[in-house]
Design a protein with these regions (language model features):
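CheY-like receiver
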Residues: 64-68, 105, 230, 258, ...
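Residue-level signal for the nucleotide or nucleotide-sugar donor/cofactor binding architecture
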Residues: 57, 86, 94-97, 170, ...
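Short-chain dehydrogenase/reductase
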Residues: 84, 207, 272-275
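Structural element of the ATP-grasp superfamily
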Residues: 102, 190, 227, 320-321
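N-terminal Rossmann-like NAD(P)+-binding domain of SDR-like oxidoreductases, especially those catalyzing
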Residues: 1-203
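C-terminal substrate-binding subdomain of Rossmann-fold SDR/epimerase-dehydratase oxidoreductases
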Residues: 231-342
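Active-site proximal helix/loop that lines the substrate pocket
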Residues: 77-83, 119-122, 208-214, 244, ...
Length: 342
């Protein structure tokens, strides 16, 4: 299949590109190579794919990039936490308007298969379980509570501590920052496009992705990259809150495999898929694991916090396994050891 891969010069995009080539697809990459995401010179080659250097908001460039294409994998986006109000226009323009421009161009070109990179952030705090009230949606955490060292979100009914729950794709949207809002908007735009054109959408809600090629020294570096960079400088990783916040860390090669499978196998309707390892870990666990494999200093739990961060978000990825026959291949210990060898 001939496909267009937006954001194909980025961290996840490069791995998706390799997976597409490995499975025999012909790929055209569209990427703006924006300097706040790409290190100098990175992305100037994309492994033999045709590269269109352009912004996804450039309708004429997107029209040209879609010529002869059968499907689109849309990964181009501004990422990060998105808690600075000054960043709101960039998130809305890069992610929301960019997706709208792409979808309009796909409608003009008659391209009806979309694989969309969404994110676990659409769920906000996800779900928690109260001993008395069962599964509930945790409220936003207050600055006052976190400043006092109280990091667990309370039950919105009785105020008791909540146990974290796995979230599946039926969990309601609850975006807590600009990036999350933009990802929800992308999914809604894609759903509307599919209804009007009869196209298909596979929205892949990536959980915490790590692995080779992670951005290390940009504003968008994930926690694994931040910890690794600190350890390579001989510094102790700085762990926010109490280190017990839970995440589903999933290797980028597994994410790439899921993305390409969705492109190949989901051919009708609109469907969301969580992409996670299925094994929740705490942020503190990751920091200690990286410190061990890199023979670095022990992590320091700082108690610092960021408004807009969620406490726990862990995936139920059974739909992806069941419907697309996907299984993660890289376990946590193997992934940590691989990071140490980079």
């Amino acid at each position: 299949m001939r496909v267009l891969l937006t954001g194909g010069a980025g961290f996840i995009g490069r791995h998706v590109l390799r997976e597409l080539f490995a499975r025999g697809h012909e790929v055209r990459v569209l990427d703006s190579l924006r300097p706040d995401v790409h290190a100098t010179g990175s992305g100037s080659t994309v492994g033999g794919a045709e590269l269109v250097i352009a912004d996804v908001r450039d309708a004429k460039a997107v029209d040209r990039a879609l010529e002869g294409v059968e499907g689109v994998l849309h990964l181009a986006a501004k990422v990060g936490l998105g808690v600075d109000v000054g960043d709101l226009p960039d998130y809305a323009s890069s992610n929301d308007a960019g997706t709208a421009v792409l979808l309009a161009a796909m409608a003009r070109a008659g391209v009806k298969r979309l694989t969309l990179a969404s994110s676990m952030v659409v769920y906000g705090e996800g779900l928690g379980r109260c001993e008395e009230h069962g599964a509930v949606r945790p409220p936003p955490r207050s600055a006052a509570a976190m400043a006092a060292g109280s990091f667990e979100p309370p039950c919105p009914v009785c105020g008791r501590p909540l146990a974290p729950e796995l979230v599946d794709e039926t969990t309601p949207f609850d975006p807590r920052n600009a990036y999350a809002i933009s990802k929800v908007a992308q999914e809604f735009y894609a759903n509307t496009w599919a209804q009007v054109t009869g196209g298909s959408v596979a929205a892949l809600r990536y959980h915490n992705v790590y692995g080779p090629g992670m951005p290390r020294d940009t504003p968008y570096a994930g926690v694994a990259a931040i910890f690794t960079s600190a350890l390579r400088r001989g510094e102790a990783p700085q762990v926010f809150e109490d280190g017990r916040q839970r995440r589903d860390f999933v290797h980028v090669r597994d994410v790439a495999a899921a993305t390409v499978l969705a492109c190949e196998r989901h051919v009708s309707g609109v469907r969301a898929f969580n992409v996670g390892s299925g094994t929740p870990r705490t942020v503190g666990e990751m920091a200690h694991a990286l410190a061990r494999v890199l023979h670095g200093p022990k992590p320091v739990v700082t108690g610092h916090y960021r408004l807009g961060d969620v406490r726990h978000i862990t995936a139920d990825s059974s739909r992806l396994r069941r419907e697309l026959n996907w299984l993660p291949q890289v376990d946590f210990d193997q992934g940590m050891a691989e990071l140490a060898g980079l």
